[in-house]
Amino acid sequence: MRLSKFKFHLPQELIALFPSVDRDESRLMVVYHKTGRVEHVIFKDIIQYFNEKDTFIFNDTSVIPARLNGNKEKTGARVEVFLLRELDPIQRIWDVLVDPARKIRIGNKLYFENEDSDTIVAEIIDNTTSRGRIIRFLYDGPYESFKKILYNLGNMPIPDYLDRKVTKEDRERYQTIYAKNEGAVVAPAAGLHFSHELMKRLELKGCELTFITVHSGMGNFRAIDVEDLFKYKSESERIVINTETATKINQAKQNRKQICAVGTSVLRTIEDRENVVTSQGYLNPFTGWTNKFIFPPYNFITSTSLITGFHLPLSSMLLQVAAFGGFDLIMDVYKQAIEAKYRFGVYGDAMLII
């Protein structure tokens, strides 16, 4: 399969710059992958497509305010530091990306402050890639105080394609209501559509709500740089699947109930046949890393349905959706979505493939 097959024209005005007023009021396109039938409803109506003991798998990662704007200590030059992951909480050491990279070298000190007078100084201690650096924050106070100040200084890492300033609303809306375990720098966007009320309605209907953790990284928005998809290697992400969750999902499979992956981060994680899932489609508890990359054609052995968004051309998420629903069908329904003016991107509308 070639990357260029996933190119299509997306009118700029269909990229949602802001979320819908209410989480569960977005539009929902329902796609029956066996027949190709398409229905158009509101997201909160998704409950009508599931029955008692059908099982949802959510990603409970929490997005950190990863984008810091500061200055070089001596020159005052503006810099941006993007937090990727914490390496050593005791030493306050992080793996980061910096911009402008050519002007930020080992030994440089960076200064960050905000309108609330939160301040912190950091020192570059190593290089990792052309833009990658290892940074140590120079803070001697309690760890919780450090994290509070750091996150107060940071902005939510909304994707660059939104091409707008971060707002206070993003702090809440670029986060699922069930976010629990911090570590992501990309929101599990399919989950953004779930409200507290909708989650409660699913529980009352008898659906099983299960949670895994996938700390989604910048690789989700990194451009695929090869035409031959077999040559592409995705970035690794840290995942956690506990025993309780694995047991519930395996029971659903054994009882032939629907298993719905909420988002592509969940979908690819539970298809990791090296670490997570057996050849029969049963999950093992696992804590570690995965770099599973999925594109058509692919035989899924765990999920029976998928909730996802409308993704941008040539994106890794689009490849996964096309693998799940079938390439021809998904590219056709994307044409229908554009004609019907569905909203694309992380704050856009949703799709259910069943």
Curated annotation (Swiss-Prot):
GO biological process per UniProt: queuosine biosynthetic process; tRNA wobble guanine modification
GO molecular function: S-adenosylmethionine:tRNA ribosyltransferase-isomerase activity
CC annotations in GO: cytoplasm
Superkingdom of origin organism: Bacteria
Localization terms from the record: Cytoplasm
InterPro entries referenced in this protein's UniProt entry, alphabetically: QueA, QueA_dom1, QueA_dom2, QueA_sf
Record keyword Transferase present: yes
Catalytic activity line of the entry: 7-aminomethyl-7-carbaguanosine(34) in tRNA + S-adenosyl-L-methionine = epoxyqueuosine(34) in tRNA + adenine + L-methionine + 2 H(+)
Major localisation: cytoplasm
Keywords assigned: Cytoplasm, Queuosine biosynthesis, S-adenosyl-L-methionine, Transferase
Entry's EC annotation: 2.4.99.17
Transferase recorded as keyword: yes
Pfam name, any one: Queuosine_synth
Role summary: Transfers and isomerizes the ribose moiety from AdoMet to the 7-aminomethyl group of 7-deazaguanine (preQ1-tRNA) to give epoxyqueuosine (oQ-tRNA).
Entry-linked PANTHER family: S-ADENOSYLMETHIONINE:TRNA RIBOSYLTRANSFERASE-ISOMERASE
Family statement: Belongs to the QueA family.
Protein's name in the database: S-adenosylmethionine:tRNA ribosyltransferase-isomerase
Organism: Azobacteroides pseudotrichonymphae genomovar. CFP2
